[in-house]
Amino acid sequence: MPGFFSAAEIEPLRSACHADPTLGGALMALADSQGNAQEVVPYTEVSNDLVGVIPRLERVVTAAETLLGGAPYHRHSKLSMKQPGSAGTWDWHQDYGYWYHQGVLRPDMLTVAIAVDENTTENGCMSVVKASHKLGRIEHGRKGEASGVDQARLEQALKHLERVEWHLDAGDAVYFHCNLLHASGSNTSDRPRTIVHCSYNAVDNLPFLPGQEAHAYRPLAVVPDNAIVEGAWDTVFSNQIFISDDGDSGYGYKVLRAGTWANSQPPRMGVSAEL
């Protein structure tokens, strides 16, 4: 979806991320399979800061509802940042490979990836395997210091399906199914690569396992599409409640550095022990 966000809408977040690449200390570093740092910070609460308004914009929520075929709720969002020269990668995975183990019964879930910076091959854009969501959920497990999809099935998928890179301009967006195989590479450029992921679940598909309070249903206060340009937000992220510590590697990733954000949720993102 080219130009899903205008330059005027995306620039405040882009500028803030460039000015403070640790997001005030909120950003945590998770290990990839080779032990390299990959920086990310999730949040489930939606504030009146810019990062809390983005997942609630009418056009963002309406598209999610159309694709899901029913009412969605905000499961979580996250900022994923690759600084210039960072070696960290996201290994091949499906989001539902993890969310299934959090007690979500059906794969009626999706994510919209919103480019804050230009996303290129050189700075670590996302790669996907086209139509791989039709393969269903593939088992995930430990891969070095991280976790990822079963390698034998990944190899077969890559033999039969096309791998493509998502080259995005700032403000472009892509919605993708929770079973779509995706990954991203290192940033070998001198430019940062920041992307916002907003994930939604169907309201009749809540996780049933205990310990998932962070992903409980909360009514979504949708805001008009002009909320950002009209300045109907407080700060970019200063008041946002982030999850700055993933607990004990809840998604199967080793935590190299926990965030130190003052407004931080307890670590309640973990998956069941089967992963």
Predicted features by range, described:
Residues 93, 102-121, 167, 199-202:
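Short, conserved beta-strand element in jelly-roll/cupin
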Residues 1-103, 141, 211, 221, ...:
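Non-heme Fe(II)-dependent double-stranded beta-helix
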Residues 119-185:
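Double-stranded beta-helix
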Residues 23, 27-28, 33, 180-275:
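Non-heme Fe(II)/2-oxoglutarate
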Residues 83, 129-136, 199-205:
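Short edge-strand/loop segments of extracellular domains
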Residues 70-77, 88-90, 108-114, 124, ...:
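Generic beta-strand structural signal
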Residues 92-100, 114, 153, 159:
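Active-site glycine-rich loop that binds ribose-phosphate moieties when present
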Residues 98-109, 161-162, 168, 191-192:
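A short beta-loop-beta micro-motif enriched in histidine and acidic residues
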